Amino acid sequence: PAIGKPVRQIHVWQRDERLPGDDGFEPGPTALSEEVGRLLAEKMPRESAAPPPEVNRVSRPGSQVMDCVLVDPQEWWLGVHEASSIPARWPGGVCPLDDASPGVSRAYLKMYESLEWSRMPVRARDLCAEIGSSPGGSCLALLDRGLRVLGIDPAEMDEEVLSHPNFTHIRKRGRDVRRRDFSEVRWLMTDINVAPKYTLDTVEEIVTHDSVRVQGMLLTLKLTDWELAEQIPALLDRIRGWGFGYTRARQLAFNRREFCVAALRQRTSRRPKTLQKFKKHRRPTRLDGI
């Protein structure tokens, strides 16, 4: 953090007591964190004419932020950080969901966060494919962005997704789909409950085919064994070897025992400023811990 730079924002969050999705728990601001933030803002010294610091708002790039982690009622951790990256701008590193209510499954939340974190330059009417799409939470998040979506999964999809005019269901496993069906796909997403090697085997067969022109990928890779975390650098190198030179990984706030890989062929691609956000009509539903 820059010494002497004024603190204009405060981020307060509680330690996660459960995995995301367990018993309805999801990370993010709570009534307690908001109240503690308000009290800290009132007590923080400032110039007489200066407004109190903002509490649990998305920080401006480069701003100085005071952190307070509520470990338990008797233990708080205090610190300061500079909002030098997208997750560093989010309170507690948790992607804000605005007023959206996820539907179908909590995969909706994971896709929302992966798009916000990666700044993947998707545009309305682009064609994307998701391997492992059932029951359709991720697909619904993509459809709400104005994308056209191929959902690839032998299992059934939710009726809300199936009825969307921009959705097509291919009831097959990813490696059983004809390569020409991917010829117009610009973005590839995966969320398959298998070890990372098997996910990447399927993806490699697709994106290295002569007829396929995928420009970017968001891959959810499962840590079926915690020791697999040691292989993450090698997994990223493998993806780069397919021509995706700009590749990075992060365990997102809404991830469970898994992490997200964002991969682009060209780093010069930029996300449009007018990207369509989530629609307000999403009905609340019970989320399964997947």
Each model region followed by its residue ranges:
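SAM-dependent transferase fold signal centered on methyltransferase-like domains
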Residues: 1-290
